[in-house]
Amino acid sequence: MAVTKLVLVRHGESQWNNENRFTGWYDVDLSDKGRSEAKAAGQLLKDEGFAFDFAYTSVLKRAIHTLWNVLDELDQAWLPVEKSWKLNERHYGALQGLNKAETAEKYGDEQVKQWRRGFAITPPELTRDDERFPGHDPRYASLSDKELPLTESLALTIERVVPYWNETILPRIKSGERVIIAAHGNSLRALVKYLDNMGEDEILELNIPTGVPLVYEFDENFKPIKRYYLGNADEIAAKAAAVANQGKAK
C-alpha cells in the first residue's frame, strides 16, 4: 500500500518576524526573505516529486502568500484552497505588536518563554475596545463572541485546530487526496502535538522554522509513522534555533 503523505509549511519570514515582534492575528505580509523562503519550499517539494490535490491555509496573508508562492513553484496555482481562521496563528493578546526582546527585558526571558511556548499560559488579554480585537475585522464577522479571542494559549489554539483537522482535513486525506497546509508556528505546533501525542514539556521545546516543508507519513490507519523536514539539516536546525531565541532579551 502506498504511504499517505501530508505536507505542512509554516509561512515564510514575515515583516514582523524580521522586526522580532509578536504577531498573532495581526495581518502582516511576508518580507522579501519570506517570499524567497516560500519559493524555495516550493522548489524543494517539486524536486522531491510532490504534487497536491487540495490546500488549506489561514485567513492571514503571510500564510496565504506563502501558499501562493509554493503552488506557483509547483505549477499548481490553480489548486483549490480552503481558508479558515481555525488555522490562524495563536492570538497573542495585548502582546501583539510588541518587540519580543524588549518584552523579555521588561518581564524576563523565562516569562516571555512561558508566554510564547507554555502550553496553557495565556499572554495578557486585549480589551474589546482595543483596535487589535478581531471583532473589529470584517473577515471574522461570522464568528460568535465565544470564538473571538482576547488572547490564546497553545491549549486554546489546539481546541480550534484539532477539530478542524478531524472534521475537515483528515476526511479529505482519507478519501485519497494529497493535501498541503500552509499555516503558522503555533497552529502547526498544535497539530504536531496532537498527531505525535507529545507531552506538554516536549511541545515547549518544539520550534518550527519558517518556510521549510514538514512531511508526515501515515500508515493505513492514518497514524503517523514518520515526520521529517525537507532540505539541509544544518540550515533547518539553525533556523529552528533562531525561532527559539526570538523571545530572549538582547
Curated annotation (Swiss-Prot):
InterPro entries: His_Pase_superF_clade-1, His_PPase_superfam, PG/BPGM_mutase_AS, Phosphogly_mut1
EC number: 5.4.2.11
Active site residues per record: 11, 89
Pathway given in the UniProt record: Carbohydrate degradation; glycolysis; pyruvate from D-glyceraldehyde 3-phosphate: step 3/5
Chemical reaction(s) catalysed: (2R)-2-phosphoglycerate = (2R)-3-phosphoglycerate
Residues at which substrate binds: 10-17, 23-24, 62, 89-92, 100, 116-117, 185-186
Keyword Metal-binding (UniProt): no
A Pfam short name: His_Phos_1
Key words, A-Z: Gluconeogenesis, Glycolysis, Isomerase
GO terms for biological process, alphabetical: gluconeogenesis; glycolytic process
Gene3D superfamilies per record: Phosphoglycerate mutase-like
Molecular function GO terms recorded: phosphoglycerate mutase activity
Residues with site note (Transition state stabilizer): 184
Family statement drawn from the similarity comment of this UniProt entry: Belongs to the phosphoglycerate mutase family. BPG-dependent PGAM subfamily.
Subunit-level organization: Homodimer.
PANTHER family, sorted: PHOSPHOGLYCERATE MUTASE
NCBIfam families reported for this sequence: pgm_1 (TIGR01258), PRK14115.1 (NF010713)
Chain's role: Catalyzes the interconversion of 2-phosphoglycerate and 3-phosphoglycerate.
Protein name (record): 2,3-bisphosphoglycerate-dependent phosphoglycerate mutase
Organism: Pectobacterium carotovorum subsp. carotovorum (strain PC1)
